[in-house]
Structures are given as structure tokens and as C-alpha cells.
Curated annotation (Swiss-Prot):
PROSITE patterns from the UniProt entry: RIBOSOMAL_S8
One Pfam family matching this protein: Ribosomal_S8
Recorded name of the encoding gene: rpsH
UniProt keyword Transit peptide, yes or no: no
Keyword RNA-binding attached: yes
One biological process term in Gene Ontology: translation
Similarity field: Belongs to the universal ribosomal protein uS8 family.
Name used for this protein in its record: Small ribosomal subunit protein uS8
Keywords of this entry: Ribonucleoprotein, Ribosomal protein, RNA-binding, rRNA-binding
GO MF entries: rRNA binding; structural constituent of ribosome
InterPro entries per record: Ribosomal_uS8 (IPR000630), Ribosomal_uS8_CS (IPR047863), Ribosomal_uS8_sf (IPR035987)
Length: 133
């Protein structure tokens, strides 16, 4: 059985792992997933991630999740916005801060995958992949 939305699968795995208070979660590797995880690390939502080869030519990403000193997860909400069936695009004019600048949109632009803050600085819009708070 093939998976139609691999990014939604990754976000769901992260959400479920944090609800279960796990320290690590594994997801299949792709360059797009790595770029999204780079943004999550830069913005402080996850601690780090490591790519390792499971079998010959098949790579997996091991994500180290981040929690507050009280044990609460840093990610309160992580949801897919643009899906394979319904793409959502925002121009720079319509790109507003998410959750009063406490959360971010992760956007795929012509200059790469980045947070909404970075996209506003560069003056570019694009496809809204997901929102994180």
C-alpha cells in the first residue's frame, strides 16, 4: 500500500510521539522532510535529528524531541495545511504571523523551505506546508 501524503505521516508521528512522551521518533528519510526538520530545529521546536542508513540504500531519520524543564512538549500543535488534494498558497501580502508570533508556518518557496518569519524577511510567499505552535 502506498502512502499518499508522507509529510502528514511525519507530522503525525511527531505529534503521537510527543503525546506519548517519547524522546525519539523514527521516520523514513527524504530531502523535503530533512528541510522541514531543519526549520523545526532552527525555530526550537525539536532538539535535533540524525540520518542513518537502515538497509542498503534505505535511510531513516531519527528525531530527538524537545521538552520543557517541566516535561511539557515544545510542540503544542503541528498540523498539515497544504495537502495533495488541496494546495494552499500565500503571497507575501497575505503572510501574517501565526498565533501572535508564538507559532510558525513552514513554507515551500522558490528559495527553499523556510519559516514564515524568514519568508517575510526575504519578501517571498509560497505553499504553506504546515503550521506549528
Amino acid at each position: 500500500m502506498s502512502m499518499s501524503d508522507t509529510l502528514a505521516d511525519m507530522l503525525t508521528r511527531i505529534r503521537n510521539a510527543q503525546r506519548s512522551r517519547l524522546m525519539y521518533v523514527n521516520v523514513p528519510s527524504s530531502r523535503r522532510r530533512e528541510a522541514i526538520l531543519d526549520v523545526l530545529v532552527k525555530e526550537g521546536f525539536i532538539h535535533s535529528f540524525l540520518i542513518h542508513e537502515v538497509r542498503n540504500g534505505i535511510k531513516e531519520i531519527n528525531i530527538k524531541l524537545k521538552y520543557s524543564p517541566k516535561g511539557e512538549s515544545n510542540i503544542k500543535e503541528i498540523n498539515r495545511v497544504s495537502t495533495p488534494g488541496k494546495r494552499v498558497y500565500l503571497s507575501i501580502k497575505k503572510l501574517r504571523p501565526y498565533y501572535n508570533n508564538m507559532g510558525i508556518y513552514i513554507i515551500s518557496t522558490s528559495k527553499g523551505i523556510m519559516s514564515d518569519r524568514e519568508a517575510r524577511k526575504l519578501g517571498v510567499g509560497g505553499e504553506v506546508i504546515c503550521k506549528v505552535f
